[in-house]
Amino acid sequence: MTNDNPRTVIAQGTFDLLHPGHVHYLEEAAAMGDELYVIVARKSNVDHKKAPICSAAQRRDVVDALEVVDEAILGHEEDIFVPIERIDPDVIALGHDQHHDADAIEDELERRGIDCVVDRASGRESTREDEVLSTRLIIDRILERRDR
């Protein structure tokens, strides 16, 4: 039976140097609905950590290649809510460690007339001793090994 009203989910993030933690987040987000759209942050919107290494287009293309993702798009340069308004999701899935305040997002969504739930995905523990689940830690490991 086909669902005439598919449940649309948005996940968002920087997704620089894609790693298993990103994949876990996107798999959980996809499980929250029927269609998963991923908004990939532009460099101009990444102010809570160092700028991404890879270009926005490259990060979008890598995320878009994942089977669980229906469509990956670039975020808006100035207003992060513009693509959310266009997609009009049922759910916004936040990553377990993302800095966003769910209550503040819900307030802004309500102000803009967007009726959706904000949920937070769970974290993922390393399953192997050598597994790295953080872009920052991947970069640190690269720098450490290059200094040898």
Swiss-Prot record:
Enzymatic class: transferase
InterPro entries assigned to the protein according to its UniProt record, in alphabetical order: Archaeal_FAD_synthase, Cyt_trans-like, FAD_synth_RibL, Rossmann-like_a/b/a_fold
Entry annotated with the keyword Flavoprotein: yes
Biological or metabolic pathway of the protein: Cofactor biosynthesis; FAD biosynthesis; FAD from FMN: step 1/1
Catalyzed reactions: FMN + ATP + H(+) = FAD + diphosphate
Binding-site positions, ATP: 14-15, 19-22, 97
EC code(s) of this entry: 2.7.7.2
Cofactor(s), names only, from the UniProt record: a divalent metal cation
Record key words, sorted: ATP-binding, FAD, Flavoprotein, FMN, Nucleotide-binding, Nucleotidyltransferase, Transferase
The keyword Protein transport appears for this protein: no
GO molecular function: ATP binding; FMN adenylyltransferase activity
One BP annotation, GO: FAD biosynthetic process
Function: Catalyzes the transfer of the AMP portion of ATP to flavin mononucleotide (FMN) to produce flavin adenine dinucleotide (FAD) coenzyme.
Similarity comment text for this entry: Belongs to the archaeal FAD synthase family.
Quaternary structure note: Homodimer.
HAMAP family xref list: FAD_synth_arch
Record's protein name: FAD synthase
Source organism of the structure: Natrialba magadii (strain ATCC 43099 / DSM 3394 / CCM 3739 / CIP 104546 / IAM 13178 / JCM 8861 / NBRC 102185 / NCIMB 2190 / MS3)
Highest classification ranks of the organism: Archaea, Methanobacteriati, Methanobacteriota, Stenosarchaea group, Halobacteria
